[in-house]
A protein has these predicted regions:
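Positively charged n-region of N-terminal signal peptides that target proteins for export
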Residues: 1-7
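Helix N-cap / beta->alpha transition motif
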Residues: 3, 299-303, 367-369
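C-terminal motif of bacterial Sec signal peptides marking the signal peptidase cleavage site
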Residues: 15-18
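Preferential activation on post-signal-peptide N-terminal prodomains/segments
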Residues: 20-260
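Short, solvent-exposed coil/turn segments at beta-strand boundaries
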Residues: 129, 136-138, 272-279, 343-344, ...
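Segments that shape or occlude catalytic/ligand-binding pockets
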Residues: 184, 188-346, 350-357
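C-terminal soluble interaction/assembly domains
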Residues: 362-377
């Protein structure tokens, strides 16, 4: 009996010892897991600080940052995609594109232009419509009707004649909704291999407002002794149309064409659409792209700090507010021998500039290589 009791006591001690050992291991594991969780949380916190949704800072009396940070869909913090040109360009598929705009009808005339590394072809489709495509991948489809419509609007708010807001007081026209018109335009663009962002600007061109604004524009040009345009004889509901402006995109990135000089418009696709369909289309600098590799990119926080410094060194009463930082792809050059474009991920910085308190201001843009933070001009 004593031996049996001794065995049970020893067995109990072993079990207790094992439990304590197990609890000790479990406790160590919990501590380790807690440390990992805390490290992960800290890492996430640092990442969120580096790649926030918004940056706000008063750098000085004249320089402020209140910037929305815009990332592509499925963006991974600290990572960006590097792309290379791949596929058929607008110039290479110009014959198929012209056929689509001609809608099966024969082309009336073709005019070819060539000098140095530049080529273009202009096609007369009807008495009132035509299309030109260049080796720089610029497409311009135009019509007399679209010209009359575009004569009534100045959408650049840097000019005193700006009236874009007059065409943004309503959303839909009677002949088709804005959304359906946009879907049809987007479908057509996809057919010719052009991807665009849904972040578009739309001007609702109703005939009454166009008639009113056409007269204002005409009078303004006469007062400035500038060559005027030919006014439309009569306006009616048949002239109602939508004027869309958007940007070329790739994998969710806005794509900025090759830049040369002041006044580059980030919205490099514009379309006028009426009850007959597309009556005007301009595409500037489209390059088909495919992914080359994933790269590390700098944070928008660093970009904002980098841009704020030279702005702060400007000695004037002008104020600068950095309002948006958008991760894009930008074409920084083109090899004319191969026809291939050089493309890099970049941060596009939108800055509002005001010369005084009463000045409505205007927006200017700065571009930085997202990998190296080198300025792109």
């Amino acid at each position: 009996m004593r031996i049996r009791k001794l065995i049970w006591i020893l067995a109990g001690c072993c079990l207790l010892s094992g439990c304590r050992s197990g609890n000790a291991n479990l406790s160590e594991k919990n501590v380790s897991d807690t440390e990992v969780t805390e490290e992960s949380a800290e890492s996430r916190k640092e990442t969120e600080q580096d790649f926030p949704q918004r940056i706000q800072e008063d750098v000085s009396e004249n320089v402020h940052i209140d910037a929305e940070c815009v990332y592509p869909e499925n963006f991974q913090e600290g990572k960006g995609l590097k792309a290379v040109q791949s596929g058929s360009t607008l110039w290479e598929q110009r014959e198929q594109i012209v056929d689509k705009f001609a809608k099966g009808n024969p082309v009336l005339d073709v005019e070819e232009t060539s000098y140095d590394d530049f080529q273009s072809e202009s096609y007369t489709l009807t008495e009132t419509t035509g299309i030109s495509i260049t080796s720089e991948n610029v497409l311009n489809y135009f019509s007399d009707q679209a010209t009359h419509i575009l004569n009534t609007i100045m959408e650049d708010d840097r000019f005193d004649s700006y009236n874009g807001n007059e065409f943004q007081t309503t959303t839909d026209l009677a002949f088709i909704s804005q959304e359906e018109a946009w879907n049809q335009i987007k479908s057509f663009l996809q057919e010719i291999g052009v991807e665009v962002t849904d972040a578009y600007t739309c001007y609702v061109m109703d005939y009454k407002t166009m008639q009113q604004e056409e007269e204002k524009m005409y009078q303004l040009l006469q007062e400035e002794d500038t060559k005027t345009f030919e006014k439309k004889e009569q306006w009616s509901a048949d002239d109602d149309s939508y004027y869309f402006k958007t940007s070329i995109a790739w994998n969710g990135y806005p794509v900025i064409p090759y830049m040369s000089g002041e006044g580059n418009d980030e919205q490099n696709v514009s379309v006028v659409y009426d009850k007959s369909g597309i009556i005007s289309m301009m595409i500037i600098g489209h390059y088909p792209m495919q992914e080359k590799e994933e790269v590390d990119i700098e944070s928008p926080v660093k970009v904002a700090e980098l841009l704020a410094e030279p702005l702060n060194n400007i000695i004037s009463d002008t104020t600068y507010e950095i309002q948006k930082l958008t991760l894009c792809q930008v074409v920084i050059g083109k090899n004319h021998e191969t026809g291939m474009a050089e493309i890099v991920p970049c941060w596009k910085c939108s800055v509002q500039v005001k010369n005084d308190q009463e000045d409505p201001g205007y927006t200017t843009y700065y571009y930085y290589n997202a990998e190296t933070l080198e300025s792109i001009s």
